[in-house]
Amino acid sequence: MGLPWYRVHTVVLNDPGRLLSVHIMHTALVSGWAGSMALYELAVFDPSDPVLDPMWRQGMFVIPFMTRLGITNSWGGWSISGGTITNPGIWSYEGVAGAHILFSGLCFLAAIWHWVYWDLEIFCDERTGKPSLDLPKIFGIHLFLSGIACFGFGAFHVTGLYGPGIWVSDPYGLTGKVQSVNPAWGAEGFDPFVPGGIASHHIAAGTLGILAGLFHLSVRPPQRLYKGLRMGNIETVLSSSIAAVFFAAFVVAGTMWYGSATTPIELFGPTRYQWDQGYFQQEIYRRVGAGLAENLSLSEAWSKIPEKLAFYDYIGNNPAKGGLFRAGSMDNGDGIAVGWLGHPIFRDKEGHELFVRRMPTFFETFPVVLVDADGIVRADVPFRRAESKYSVEQVGVTVEFYGGELNGVIYSDPATVKKYARRAQLGEIFELDRATLKSDGVFRSSPRGWFTFGHATFALLFFFGHIWHGARTLFRDVFAGIDPDLDAQVEFGAFQKLGDPTTRRQVV
């Protein structure tokens, strides 16, 4: 046939049996990839430190999605929360991976069967005997079935009525666990950070889908609408399906990048806006202030800060710090976090407490500037020593650590003070192991960044695909050169000019 690569799908355009076959094969590939990827991630995943080396630091992509749906245990005897277990049950990480691979194999066989037995009676129009699909009826069937699945997920799986529930955490990603969720039917259900909205929206959308499916099964479209929207053309199905997919891809790119109840920070890492807004820093200071109000010493108050919370307040966990073409996990960048060194508090010789200005997200380098509580610059690390007025040496800056591994340690030598001032630009200070993975010290993005980039990019491509195929199906007659208002039966090849009887070809 000699088709160019971008036209090869025309071979299934008027062949319902093989059109079904290639879609089943596509499902086999997707499911097989998911199962295989899960097994690969489980082979390289280290569950030993869920606080400082969580799944998102290790670049896990499919494990977070399994976890948010209620899978927490492994046949290897470990739990995602860090404990050990003896009876993980069939629906472990490996069980889900195996189920996907098994389903992939069954789809593979089904695809082969439908490719071989393509000419089935069900695909034929009784009146003409030619291949034909009742597309509005098929639409109704699919809408009805997807409505049942959507309703069932919201009413049973998420609520824990028949299922595990979903991953639910606090606003600071400290207490996350799988639990059942009650539907939120009030205005709070529209808050993207309220888990109850997931249950209520699936129940509502599923109910609507069931009713809409029954409507499309029982009511035929008007003839004018049927013809106007080209409902008899399979390319209309392709165009509208692409629209649904690219719309969903844009939505999930947004919920992933900006954060929501569906993308917990314990599973996907924090968002860039939490660094930009000093979200975790404010909570840490609030907790320290509350500790001081309870007559704790500064050291005791900082020692009560959870290591997990301090780790979120580190720029290396910002997904926007990864660069284009920097492949690999966060651990391959700045290294595996080993421990929190503590919170450094800088003071000059006059006793002013100094704060290091933090690096904004899109800077690779940033001047080291120390300001007091009023925002007045008191010290810095100068670019030109000859012109310096506020250098660490001149101002006599010291640093003392509170909490963490260096709790109570004071440094006064300028070289060490400057070292920790530079590191304080990046948030809380952690000891990082760069030797184990030969980490190069260049920040990487988290799975949150990869997911957003991938889905936003493909959504844009699919948007153009929707326009392309929508235009092809709506204006097919124009592209083919056939006047839709031409009532006379046209015999192709009879005239030199299509439909013009004055140009009848001469029979030789």
Curated annotation (Swiss-Prot):
Annotated keywords: Chlorophyll, Chloroplast, Chromophore, Membrane, Photosynthesis, Photosystem II, Plastid, Thylakoid, Transmembrane, Transmembrane helix
GO biological process: photosynthetic electron transport in photosystem II
Keyword flag Cytoplasm: no
Cofactor note: Binds multiple chlorophylls. PSII binds additional chlorophylls, carotenoids and specific lipids.
Protein role: One of the components of the core complex of photosystem II (PSII). It binds chlorophyll and helps catalyze the primary light-induced photochemical processes of PSII. PSII is a light-driven water:plastoquinone oxidoreductase, using light energy to abstract electrons from H(2)O, generating O(2) and a proton gradient subsequently used for ATP formation.
Coiled-coil boundaries: none
Membrane topology label: Multi-pass membrane protein
Any GO MF annotation of the entry: chlorophyll binding
PANTHER family from the UniProt entry: PHOTOSYSTEM II CP43 REACTION CENTER PROTEIN (PTHR33180:SF37)
Binding partners and assembly: PSII is composed of 1 copy each of membrane proteins PsbA, PsbB, PsbC, PsbD, PsbE, PsbF, PsbH, PsbI, PsbJ, PsbK, PsbL, PsbM, PsbT, PsbX, PsbY, PsbZ, Psb30/Ycf12, at least 3 peripheral proteins of the oxygen-evolving complex and a large number of cofactors. It forms dimeric complexes.
Membrane-crossing residue ranges in chain numbering: 21-36, 101-115, 140-156, 203-218, 237-252, 457-472
Protein name: Photosystem II CP47 reaction center protein
Subcellular location(s) of the protein: Plastid, Chloroplast thylakoid membrane
UniProt similarity note: Belongs to the PsbB/PsbC family. PsbB subfamily.
NADP in keyword set: no
Entry's Gene Ontology cellular component terms: chloroplast thylakoid membrane; photosystem II
Residues making up the signal peptide according to the UniProt record: none
